[in-house]
Amino acid sequence: MDKLLERFLNYVSLDTQSKAGVRQVPSTEGQWKLLHLLKEQLEEMGLINVTLSEKGTLMATLPANVPGDIPAIGFISHVDTSPDCSGKNVNPQIVENYRGGDIALGIGDEVLSPVMFPVLHQLLGQTLITTDGKTLLGADDQAGIAEIMTALAVLQQKNIPHGDIRVAFTPDEEVGKGAKHFDVDAFDARWAYTVDGGGVGELEFENFNAASVNIKIVGNNVHPGTAKGVMVNALSLAARIHAEVPADESPEMTEGYEGFYHLASMKGTVERADMHYIIRDFDRKQFEARKRKMMEIAKKVGKGLHPDCYIELVIEDSYYNMREKVVEHPHILDIAQQAMRDCDIEPELKPIRGGTDGAQLSFMGLPCPNLFTGGYNYHGKHEFVTLEGMEKAVQVIVRIAELTAQRK
């Protein structure tokens, strides 16, 4: 465990933010730097079959150290950090033996406060790693990477019985491309776990069904003084569309297993307007109903428009709820829960109000629930991780490997 913090601080020192709307994968050069660093470290540790694809997926194998027909399992984390907040020149602060109250984030007015983040009350006495208030931290998912790398070292150094352990580090998870170029056959694991969750004990095997909705509105612009019966204001049509979307089914009004419609962006002029929504729901039937609702709204608002003016709606599914795939293999969750209990952790099964690489991989034939990392408040300057949480994650990964080796 002595190198866990060192590894984490090393990884977050690299700016690995991904970038949306870029064709190339990985979308940024910084991700390549971390991938090459990890490749070198895996090779130095003596792992075999270390490969780095042209699309930035790094894979390696820790060979089994016991005989028998033990299923190969995998652990996966992503190298990119969120584009939502700067990841350049990350300057972590280490707060040992947290005693409560506000934590000043660097020099300035930014604080990490238990008033805004009550979970801090549960972390008294622990070592917190925070930002300096200017960037994100990168615990999502450099913490997961550091934990996997440390778990590999522990398995080797302590000669803990295990079967083949596959590891993979993927790019562009934060922009939805992490699993797109993942070669499940080459990975050759019976099942896997992403290490990309939050607080200690979290075990996630349910996520949203997700779709994007892009709406193009073409209007007609003339001088306002002579506009009667001629002007078709695309912005007004956009406002009417959004007024038809249920206001109480937005992200800020929902929680738990509740789905939502989210207007992510809207821009335009009288002549042309564009709207971008995302749709989320855990239930597949409700998910399909939400997509139909958007089509009905567009049809209603667009009824009776001049033929040269129109509303065009394009819906594209992004990913689906991995529950329907993971529950077909209950032992995957049983092993993870047992591993946590063996490490004095009470498992907390909760839905992901988002998605992970594991969601897509589960539908590609690799069942892949999500393990905790010990991090909180991802994608922003209030992000932090606890060293104790990271150590627990390492223990759970090691124990999962050990328990799997007992399933002969």
Swiss-Prot record:
Cofactors required: Zn(2+)
Family under the similarity heading: Belongs to the peptidase M20B family.
NCBIfam families, sorted: peptidase-T (TIGR01882), PRK05469.1 (NF003976), PRK13381.1 (NF009920)
Chain sites annotated for binding Zn(2+) 1: 78, 140, 196
Annotated catalysed reactions: Release of the N-terminal residue from a tripeptide
Enzyme active site: 80, 173
Keyword Cytoplasm assigned: yes
Sites where the protein binds Zn(2+) 2: 140, 174, 379
MF annotations from Gene Ontology: metallopeptidase activity; tripeptide aminopeptidase activity; zinc ion binding
EC number(s) on file: 3.4.11.4
Pfam families per UniProt: M20_dimer, Peptidase_M20
Cofactor-binding details, from the entry: Binds 2 Zn(2+) ions per subunit.
Functional summary from the UniProt entry: Cleaves the N-terminal amino acid of tripeptides.
Name of protein: Peptidase T
Gene source species: Escherichia coli O6:K15:H31 (strain 536 / UPEC)
Keyword entries, A-Z: Aminopeptidase, Cytoplasm, Hydrolase, Metal-binding, Metalloprotease, Protease, Zinc
Chief localisation class: cytoplasm
Enzyme type, top EC level: hydrolase
PROSITE patterns the UniProt entry points to: ARGE_DAPE_CPG2_1 (PS00758)
Listed GO biological process terms: peptide catabolic process; proteolysis
Cell compartments where the protein resides: Cytoplasm
